[in-house]
Structures are given as C-alpha cells and as structure tokens.
C-alpha cells in the first residue's frame, strides 16, 4: 500500500493537505492520473472544511502576536449565537448570525451540509447582511446543517446551526376546548374572558356580544374588541369587562379566522345583584379607635414622604438655581423654557393673534416652558455629531445620547431637531406644536418616535429616533439598478452624482421588498388615524428608513390634532405639498383622513416608480383641471394591476368612496403574503417614458427636489399676500415647481369660483 500526498496551494497563505490511499497498484493503473476530490475553488482556497478544531468557545479577543500585532478570529456576540436548532414553518424567514472579528479582518464562508454556500443555490437566493446569513421564505429543501467558518492567517473558528423546516398545514384556527368559560358576577365587578387560539397562518381575532332581536329569530352581534396596529395575539385572547351591569349579561363569542376559515366559541355572563351585607360584615367594617389612629399616622407619613421626593426632584432639576421666570428675550438664541401647549388648536382660533405671530420678529418675544419630567433630558447627556438636514429655519443633527439602564450607562444614536438663529415667534410655536403632537400620539414601530426634549438652560431640542438609511425617496433612488435609463436622468432631477451613497446591502430590490415598504407605511398611517391625527404631508421624502429597513413616518410639522372634529381647515398662507394633495384640499383647504388616503396613493406611486416625480410635465396651475377631468397618474412600471387599482381607489374624487387605512393595511397584508422574492430584471424597460421629461420639466423637477430636501421649518414660512385678488395659479407661479404651494384663502373664494367655471368651460 502506497500513499500519495496532494498539495493544493491557496491563493493567499493557506496550504491544505489531503491524503489519497491506494491499497494495491495494478499494472494497468500505472499511467492513471489522480487528482484531489476538492473542486476547483472559486474563492480564496479555503472552500474545504477547517481542520484545526471548531474553537466554538472563543468568545473574547485572543492575545495579539507580539511581532505583527495580529489576532486570530474570535466571536463578538456569542450570546446571540446560542440557539443552534431552528425549527421553522415553511415560508418563514431564518437568520443565522456569525459575529466575528480579528486582525486582519477574517474572511467568512458559509457551508450547507459541508458544501460551500453560493448566493443563488436556492430559490430566492441567500442574503448576507451585517454578519447575518438570511434565508427568506424557507422551503423543505433548506433543511440541513449550516456552518459559519471564519479564518485569517492566525487561525480559524466555526459555528454550526441546524435548520428544520416544517410543512405548513392548511387549516382554520383551532380554539382551546373549554374557553371562554361561563361567568357569574355581581354588579360593579370586573369580568375577564379568555380564549386560546392556535393557527399556523396569522389569525384575526374578534370578540362579539349577541344582541337579542325580538323581531327576528336570528341574533345580531356587536363587535366589542378587534385587532389594532399595536395589539398582539395575546392581547386579543383576553376580553376584560369593567364595572359590569345588568345590561352586559348575555352571550360573548370569541371569533378567530384566517385565510382558510373561521372558528368561534361562546360563553355566557350572568350578572347578579349585590347581596345585602350581613351583621358580621357590618361589625367588621366599623373601624375601632386604634385603627383610626394607625390610618391617620400612615397618611401623615405618606404626605411627608411625598414632600421630600418633590424637594429632591426640585433641587435635582434646577441644581440649586432659581426656577425659570418669565423674561423678555433680546436674543432668540437664548430662549428660556416655554409653556406647554395643552390645546394646539387654540393657535389657529384667534385670527389677529395668528397674524401677529406670522409677522417677522421686530420685537423681543416671551415664552415660558414648564418642565415635563416624563420627557425632559439633560443636555450634557447629548453629544451632537454631525448635521443631517438643514432648512431655512431649522436643522437636524445626528447625536449620541447617554441613557442609564439600572446602574449601567449606555450610548445610543439619535437625531436632534432644533431651530436656527433666524427663527421668529411662529417658528418656535410650530416646533412646540410638533412636540406636543409627538407626545400625544405615542410610540409605534412605523413612525419616528420622540425620545425626549431639552427645554431648560438653552434652546428647544426635540430628541427623536435616528434612521440610518435616510428618507425613502433617496433610498429608492440609491437602489435603482445601475446603468439603466432610470439612473441616467438622475442629475436632471437636482441630485449630484458625486453625492450618491452606495447601495447599503448590495441587493437589488424585490417585489416583496417594495410591497413591504408600502405595507409598513400603511400601518403607521392607520395608527395615526386611530389617534385622530392627520399628517397633511405624506410623501416618500417624509418616510425615513432604518438600518433594518423599517419604514418610519416622520415630519409632524404639518400634522394636526382633529379630536374635536373630523376635519381641519387651513386659514393661513403656509406652503403645502400641492402635487400630493387631494382635490378638496386644493380647492377648499379642508384636510381629513380621506385627504391623507389620497396622498398615500401618490406615495404608493412613488414607491413603485422607484422615486419618480409625480405628474411630470404638468404645471401646478394645470393640475386641478387635469384631475377634475378624471385624469390620474399612469400605472408605474413596477406596480401590478391590483396595486394600481388600489392607487386609483385612493384617488377617487368623492372622499367617501376612498378606502380607509384599515382596509389598505388588510389589502397590502394580503398582497405581501402573495408577493414574490424574485429580483426585478428588466428595470430599463419603460424608464425613458417615466423619468425623461422636456428641458422645461427637468428644470422644474430640479427645483422641486431641492425644495423637497428642506425641513418643515422652511415649508411653513409665510409668503407675501396676494396682490389685488390675483389667483396664485398664474404663469409666473407656474415656473416655480416648489411642491409646497401656498393654499387659497377664504377671501379668494369668489376668484376661485370664477376660475373653476373657466376650467369647466375649457374642459
């Protein structure tokens, strides 16, 4: 028996030894050529499995080599790699983390069942982002062992995951037997019904109560509880009735449905009168003299303790200094605290006061902000890093915020919104209104959330979440395919090619990606609608994108609270996004949830045109006539017919015929489940017609995009009054393609009616 050693040389620095054993050499085999069973490597020559031991427990940085300062690979986030077995239903997304570091930076390879992973080895391909291997919509063929191998010249380590894909069974939801249970309660008690739902597909759960109809044998039902944006399945499995009365007695039903079918189970609630108290109960309820003394002493101690806490907080907040007083401000940069606006709508009720606030600042103005301990942050905990955006009156900075988690300090990245030195009284009030809106609305995954405010010892700061990928419009343009007609016209849209950022993940957008973007924005808008908030400035430029591609609705500078009524009428001449506005908003200055739905339709068009400019070639003074004639935006290149029908529904002239945001969320949820992960191939087709415009339109688009980049502070500035009743849709104004166009005032209604009559006669 003879042994032959075959040496395979690495393109870098690794030598791999393989042994070939031949038991008996025959004469006929003397000229046979032997070769290594290792396939020809397509990457640096460590496509084989490592032979140095798995070293899976290397969790800290090993010692450096004294001569070269190098380090062998080591795990940096071992705690996030502890789960080895992943059992997932078919269709789910699976992520395998391989967080590793070393000096030099180790190269990472992935193996499936001892074979190297190539990007297109599976349907939908593999994705690798931030040291994570991603398998979207897994199927049964994805089962197996996945091993991450990290190697540099000082050594190698590896880590193995096991994936088990389970076949989905198509069935309607299953409700746990015996739930909900029948209940009996006295008047004034609280009652809780529970219902356990099992469903492979995402279930939609509702709680119903039957209403006896004496005129009809079949009972009617009223919906007591339905799933919202922030509710989870666990929340929906519980129904709580507070302070029950006789009228609430009856049958309660837990209803669960999915795409396969519907299941339901019911329980009865009996409400009983409160029994009269017995003699023993009355005797026990009479406190004796000792108990009275104890109660009084406890009350005094509680009051003293509360006073001590207030004094400590008072001293801590002002550091021993006098509290802020109402002062006159000669320099706007030194604005002291200002009064919290409890009712923002009051700002628009007094016309004279509003006109006074809109005038340029000629005299010092006064503010007093009350301290809100729930939201107040210390300025010394915030470090401004770099300017992200700047408008005429405001600016946004990227910053580091130090927070205290128990006894440990942590640093997080945030954004800080503030005014510039040339602000006036109205600008400060606008920023205060935005702050109050964000406080009132609360937190949601798909809106930019308020982290805190700085109102003491300096100018007003709003500290908000940071979105690493910028706004959705710029993200879509950065991710347009390279070397297509779509990208060749970008410079004419007002963008500098030298400023283009690289594609963040190097992956071409798929249909599922852009449908997901639309679905996430719709969820955020549904949440705002539930909070009685109309945004008034929905556009791709006002949707921010995080590092994890989470869509977040931003820029509440134009948002308004409509809790007191269902609409908001604008009386001032502030700039508004004309090409995104509904017909009734253009003509009557009335904004409702239905006008936000229209704007969302234009935003959908932006998404599925990869950030195209709406209504190319149409001047602002021609837009009303264009829309009144029944014309709408054409179907964007990358939208399906069903998606375009959804856009057209949003653009119904009659606001009552437009869908609400809950319906939009449900439709987009279904489209997302049916969408494909196939990558778009023919991006060049149709781009020339969609993005190329005449030279005049290109100039208009350039001006529009430059204005789009400004923040809300510039958009809300006041413009000069109309001269002699001239309508703003004149030829001189048409040369300015500013997407924020001043609305018409009520005193121009006669001129507007004449203009509408002229447009109808021309049509």
From Swiss-Prot:
Residues 34-74, 691-742 are annotated as: Disordered. It catalyses: L-tyrosyl-[protein] + ATP = O-phospho-L-tyrosyl-[protein] + ADP + H(+). It is found in: Membrane. The chain crosses the membrane at residues 292-312. Residues 28-291 are extracellular. The modification Phosphotyrosine is found at residue 568. Keywords: ATP-binding, Disulfide bond, Glycoprotein, Immunoglobulin domain, Kinase, Membrane, Nucleotide-binding, Phosphoprotein, Receptor, Repeat, Signal, Transferase, Transmembrane, Transmembrane helix, Tyrosine-protein kinase. This is Fibroblast growth factor receptor.
